[in-house]
């Protein structure tokens, strides 16, 4: 039973947490009401630390689309939130940029997510 539950959670997380595979972040933002983007890089240790925390938030907030964007692979996407440090988390609502923070602290990320849902 525990294994099946874990698989279901992974499937749900997969639907809620998207890995950017092409430079289409602008389209994702336009098509979804609320979006939280984690800008990261493979070499970024703090980015790797935050990824499971982002997955946790994705499971808890099914009204929000969470996206992980490799900032080196998709440099144009960085311009949407003026990203200059990693990890950076940016929020968008109804296609508009709301806010961004550069953090490796879960509480700060949670506050950012709450801000987009309450705005």
Language model regions located:
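N-terminal leader/targeting and pre-domain segments
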Residues: 13-35, 108-119
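Thiol-based oxidoreductase modules, predominantly thioredoxin-like and allied folds used
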Residues: 19-20, 39, 51-76
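Local sequence-structure signature of Cys/Sec-based thiol-disulfide redox active-site neighborhoods
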Residues: 24-56
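Structural micro-motif
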Residues: 81-91
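Non-catalytic, surface beta->alpha helical segment in thiol-disulfide oxidoreductase systems
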Residues: 91-119
């Amino acid at each position: 039973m525990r294994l099946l539950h874990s698989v279901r959670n992974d499937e749900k997380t997969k639907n809620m947490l998207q890995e950017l595979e092409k430079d289409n972040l602008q389209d994702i933002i336009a098509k979804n009401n609320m979006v939280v983007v984690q800008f990261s890089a493979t070499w970024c240790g703090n980015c790797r630390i935050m990824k499971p925390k982002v997955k946790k938030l994705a499971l808890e907030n099914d009204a929000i689309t969470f996206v992980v964007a490799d900032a080196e692979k998709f440099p144009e996407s960085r311009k949407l939130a003026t990203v200059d440090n990693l990890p950076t988390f940016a929020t968008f609502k109804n296609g508009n940029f709301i806010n961004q923070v550069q953090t490796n602290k879960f509480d700060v990320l949670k506050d950012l997510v709450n801000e987009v849902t309450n705005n």
